[in-house]
Every structure is written in structure tokens, then in C-alpha cells.
């Protein structure tokens, strides 16, 4: 049975356990029709497990997930007909041409023969690969391969497109070009896009709303702008040389007026303060008193990185994503064995 089609994705108390370990813990969220939704979380938070459930590759232990109103467990075939899934690792065959790859995808998705050529032409034009369609993929750049990957997920005109780390490993110029294509695809097809990323700028640029997951639980869901505004603080970042007075330094900082929260990540401290200029001289006074050497200090307005740190306690580090996905998949295999 179809549910409320105002929501392209709905989960209700979604849970997935492997033995004694709970990877996804009672997640309830709703993604509006036509929305670009970002799903963010640190290593091992449950992002990959959640996507595998939503794309019917893994069954939940309990709870429910609906895609376009269809249950991922009882209506898996209908769910697959309504989704496109572009994985982090490229899936194109590098010894086929771009067009041959899309022809293969069209056949796998059972697209009517009389519609295939027109559909491929439209997609190639949209992602600006028409002039490269007859070249073998082995000659493509990383950005071109990713565009072709995304094109393969669009051929059957899904209502929901899942993009798992779509720009990981690409340089910043290529990443921004992919962002433009994602926006273009969204505007052209009016589809819902569910995006995982560890690039905060990417989430800020693309997403209508984001959800932050940590330890298998949803911590917050809101628009990037609202999340930044809700911080209500300036951000003081400190890098210091750790020594025997480290704990005393942290304890003294917590007593400073206007300091509302402190996150520690190794030798880096992030302070959320309601009056940064008033706090900074006190930080230097305490560090001098305790003989703590500060190597760097900065005062900024809140960014999405700061929001993430506030809810999870640490940053998403560039380059961790690919390792984390392999680790999370390996953990799932081990626990199912």
C-alpha cells in the first residue's frame, strides 16, 4: 500500500542490528517530495547501513522504511523501480564507450527499446558528455566517469535518486562542477535526491535540509541555514601543544563566562562562545598561567562544520569516507556470519 506521497522517503523507528551491535537505532525521518536531503555522520555512524536498507540491499531488524509510499521490505521490487542508486565507487565499465555503458544500464532497467536512444541522448546532453559518448571510458577523467555513473542512475527516470558520496576523491574544481550537474538534474527532473557526503561545503551548497546521524541515531534535522543560526555563538578554534597541565587548561576554560560549550579533538579545542572578543584574552591569560603553548587561535562565525562538531564532538576528516564504507561493510559481513 502507498503511504503519504508528500514524502518520497519515510522511516519509522528504523532499526538494524548485527548480533549485539546496533548500526541503525530507531531512526524516524521524512524527506519531502522534490527535496535535496543531506545525510551526514562520522565514521561508523550508520550512514551506509541506512542507505542499504533504503535501497532494498539490506532488510531492517525492525521499524519501517517507505520509498514513494512503498515498503522496502514487502514491496522491494516497486521500490527498486522508483529509485536510482549511484554508489561511491564507480560502476561503469571502462572498456566500453560512454554510450555502450548507458545502453547496458537501459537494458538492465528494462527500458522500452523504442525509448532507449532518445533517453540516452537526453541524458548525455544534460551531463554534457555527448561529444565523448563514443570514447572508451578508460580515457575519461574522474569527473567524467562520475557524471556517467550518475547518468546511469537517471535513465529509468527514478522518483528518488540516492547519491552516496558523489564527489569523494575528486579535486575541488571537479567537485563544484558535479554540484552544478546535480542541481541541473534536480531542476530538470524535479526528483528527490538523498545525498551522503563528508564535504560540509557540498551539503551547504546543495541541500534543502540535512540530517546528522551519530552512533546510529539521528541527532538533528533542519536546513543548513537554520542549523548555523541555532548555534547562536561565535566559534573559537584553538590548537595547542599538549602537556601535563592539559586537563587543568580545559577545566579553566570551561569556567570562563560566555563559554557555552567546548569540544576537544586531540590537540584542537573548539569553543562555542556568546562573546568571542571578551573570551580570547582570558584564554591567553589561562594558557600563560598554566604554561600551555597555543600555536593557533581563530574567531569565526558558525559554519556547517561547527554544527557537525557540536553534535558529534569531532570533524569529518577528508579521505576517511572510502575507508569507512569498506570498514562498515566488512563489519556487517562479519556480524552476519
Model-derived regions, located:
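Conserved ABC ATPase "signature" region
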Residues: 103, 107-110, 114-132
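Conserved catalytic motifs of ABC-family nucleotide-binding domains
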Residues: 157
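ABC transporter nucleotide-binding domain
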Residues: 180-274
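Catalytic Walker B motif of ABC-type/P-loop ATPase nucleotide-binding domains
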Residues: 161-164
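Conserved ABC ATPase signature
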Residues: 136-140
Amino acid at each position: 500500500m502507498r503511504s503519504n506521497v508528500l514524502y518520497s522517503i519515510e522511516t519509522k523507528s528504523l532499526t538494524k542490528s548485527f548480533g549485539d551491535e546496533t548500526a541503525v537505532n530507531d531512526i524516524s525521518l521524512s524527506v519531502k517530495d522534490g527535496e535535496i536531503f543531506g545525510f551526514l555522520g562520522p565514521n561508523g555512524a550508520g550512514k551506509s547501513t541506512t542507505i542499504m536498507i533504503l535501497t532494498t540491499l539490506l532488510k531492517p531488524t525492525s521499524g519501517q522504511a517507505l520509498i514513494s509510499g512503498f515498503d522496502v521490505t514487502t514491496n522491494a521490487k516497486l521500490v527498486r523501480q522508483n529509485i536510482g542508486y549511484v554508489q561511491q565507487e564507480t560502476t561503469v565499465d571502462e572498456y566500453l564507450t560512454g554510450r555502450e555503458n548507458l545502453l547496458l544500464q537501459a537494458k538492465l532497467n528494462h527500458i522500452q527499446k523504442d525509448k532507449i536512444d532518445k533517453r540516452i541522448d537526453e541524458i548525455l546532453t544534460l551531463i554534457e558528455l555527448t561529444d565523448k559518448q563514443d570514447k572508451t571510458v578508460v580515457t575519461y577523467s574522474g569527473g567524467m566517469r562520475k557524471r556517467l555513473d550518475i547518468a546511469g542512475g537517471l535513465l529509468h527516470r527514478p522518483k528518488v535518486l540516492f547519491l552516496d558520496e558523489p564527489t569523494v576523491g575528486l579535486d575541488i574544481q571537479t567537485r563544484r562542477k558535479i554540484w552544478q550537474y546535480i542541481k541541473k538534474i534536480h531542476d530538470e527532473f524535479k526528483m528527490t535526491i538523498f545525498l551522503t557526503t563528508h564535504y560540509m561545503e557540498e551539503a551547504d551548497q546543495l541541500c534543502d535540509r540535512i540530517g546528522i546521524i551519530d552512533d546510529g541515531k539521528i541527532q538533528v534535522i533542519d536546513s543548513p541555514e537554520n542549523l548555523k543560526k541555532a548555534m547562536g555563538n561565535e566559534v573559537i578554534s584553538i590548537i595547542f601543544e599538549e602537556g601535563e597541565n592539559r586537563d587543568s587548561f580545559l577545566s579553566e576554560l570551561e569556567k570562563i563566562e560566555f563559554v557555552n560549550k567546548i569540544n576537544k579533538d586531540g590537540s584542537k579545542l573548539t569553543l562555542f562562545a556568546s562573546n568571542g572578543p571578551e573570551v580570547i584574552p582570558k584564554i591567553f591569560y589561562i594558557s600563560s598561567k598554566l604554561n600551555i603553548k597555543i600555536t593557533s587561535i581563530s574567531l569565526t562565525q558558525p559554519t556547517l562544520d561547527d554544527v557537525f562538531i557540536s553534535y558529534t564532538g569531532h570533524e569529518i576528516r577528508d579521505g576517511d569516507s572510502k575507508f569507512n564504507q569498506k570498514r562498515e561493510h566488512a563489519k556487517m559481513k562479519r556480524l552476519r556470519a
